[in-house]
């Protein structure tokens, strides 16, 4: 597999073409952003942790019957994935009130929902990723009804897998963001990453935040939190 030119750079990753038109290489960066890009910084070692954690969790999704773009981990920071066209819908699955949900609806953080809830946002930096519903997505031709139904099905299935896994690690899955893509034959697959960048993860006993909120809220201990959540994952899988 030959690595070719860079074809994309986002806030947290670079993407490179390969000599196979169906495959690309994702390179995870240590760069961090928050507050709609207004807050920028670096989290030492984040790229390594997010790459390796994502790959392990994507493997668990595949074993649970959820198709993903994951192919093979190449190095500490690089992974070979299927080339996809990203569906411009960010999916947010919430189990507990936190973050924008809490501030938007004027509720305290930490309220456990009777059942998980799902939100969509339009993946568009210029518009600051506005929330939208399924009818908006259809009107804007962002996806079809069939694709939206499948994305919802996969998102709730991901939630089931992640909640059970993190519970065994002594971690509560508060909420998380997902992205999906379409392969060249139109198959919907889970893409992007599953990491402390995209998930809210609290220690089950102390409710200590072990995710990017430590960066967003200037809480300190960001690198330690990322390292701790990775350690719990590795310790779990080693047993």
Which residues make up each language-model segment?
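Phosphate-binding core of ATP-grasp and ATP-grasp-like enzymes
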Residues: 111, 116-128, 159-170, 195-200
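Short histidine-centered catalytic/ligand-binding loop motif
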Residues: 38-48, 131-154
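Conserved metal-phosphate-binding beta-hairpin within the catalytic cores
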Residues: 93, 173-192
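A short glycine-rich, hydrophobically flanked beta-strand micro-motif that places a catalytic Asp/Glu
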Residues: 72-77, 166-182
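C-terminal helix-cap and adjacent tail motif
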Residues: 194-239
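Active-site loop/lid in soluble adenylation, ligation, and acyl-transfer enzymes
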Residues: 2-121, 233, 237
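Short beta-strand elements
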Residues: 28-29, 95, 189-196
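A long amphipathic alpha-helix within ATP-dependent nucleotide-binding catalytic cores
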Residues: 142-174
């Amino acid at each position: 597999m030959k690595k070719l030119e860079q074809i994309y750079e986002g806030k947290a990753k670079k993407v490179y073409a390969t000599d196979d038109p169906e495959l690309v290489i994702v390179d995870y960066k240590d760069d961090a952003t928050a507050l709609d890009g207004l807050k920028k910084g670096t989290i030492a070692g984040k790229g390594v942790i997010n790459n390796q954690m994502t790959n392990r969790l994507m493997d668990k999704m595949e074993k649970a019957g959820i198709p993903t773009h994951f192919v093979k981990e190449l190095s500490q920071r690089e992974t070979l994935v299927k080339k996809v066209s990203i569906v411009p819908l960010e999916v947010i699955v919430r189990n507990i009130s936190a973050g924008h949900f809490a501030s938007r609806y004027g509720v305290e953080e930490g309220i456990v929902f009777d059942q998980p809830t799902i939100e969509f946002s339009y993946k568009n930096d210029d518009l600051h990723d506005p929330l939208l519903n399924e009818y908006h997505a259809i009107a804007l031709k962002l996806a079809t009804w069939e694709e939206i139904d499948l994305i919802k099905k996969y998102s709730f299935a991901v939630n089931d897998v992640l909640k059970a896994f993190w519970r065994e690690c002594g971690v509560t899955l508060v909420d998380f963001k997902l992205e999906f893509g379409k392969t060249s034959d139109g198959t919907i697959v889970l893409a992007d990453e599953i990491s402390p960048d995209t998930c809210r993860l609290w220690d089950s006993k102390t409710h200590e935040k072990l995710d990017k909120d430590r960066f967003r809220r200037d809480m300190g201990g960001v690198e330690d939190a990322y390292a701790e959540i990775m350690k719990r994952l590795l310790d779990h899988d080693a047993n």
